[in-house]
């Protein structure tokens, strides 16, 4: 069994299904462990960044959606929605086997970023066009 270490605590790698970094005055990670969200605080942004790099290296099958890194297995579907109804940008909507803070959509200010993300997701999920 493979284990990972999050700020000194060891967890079986199979119990972690998502994680995200929050860079504020008090940096922290939000980690989904055994279907519950845990907040792991850090003294400074550099320590948190090191932990994020460690997690990203140990979960190569996770994909970045918005600020979250989640297991590809939990993504049930995703749909490019195009221009947002309010005209605020371009939207990609996701259906996952669990909810994440921040909703189920990611927005892009520029159309080229939106199209680039669609291409990236098509490649990540081996979409047959």
Predicted regions, residues:
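Acidic, Ser/Thr- and proline-rich intrinsically disordered linker/docking segments
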Residues: 9, 15-69, 74-129
């Amino acid at each position: 069994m493979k284990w990972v270490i999050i700020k000194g605590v060891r967890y079986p790698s199979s119990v972690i299904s998502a994680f995200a970094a929050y860079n504020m005055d008090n940096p922290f990670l939000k980690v989904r462990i055994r279907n519950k969200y845990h907040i792991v605080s850090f003294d400074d942004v550099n320590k948190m960044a090191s932990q994020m790099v460690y997690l990203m290296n140990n979960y190569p099958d996770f994909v970045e959606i918005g600020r979250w890194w989640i297991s590809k297995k939990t993504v049930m579907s995703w749909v490019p929605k195009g221009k947002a109804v309010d005209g605020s940008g371009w939207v990609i909507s996701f259906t996952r086997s669990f909810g994440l803070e921040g909703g189920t959509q990611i927005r892009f200010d520029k159309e080229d970023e939106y199209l680039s993300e669609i291409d990236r997701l098509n490649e990540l999920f081996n979409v047959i066009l």
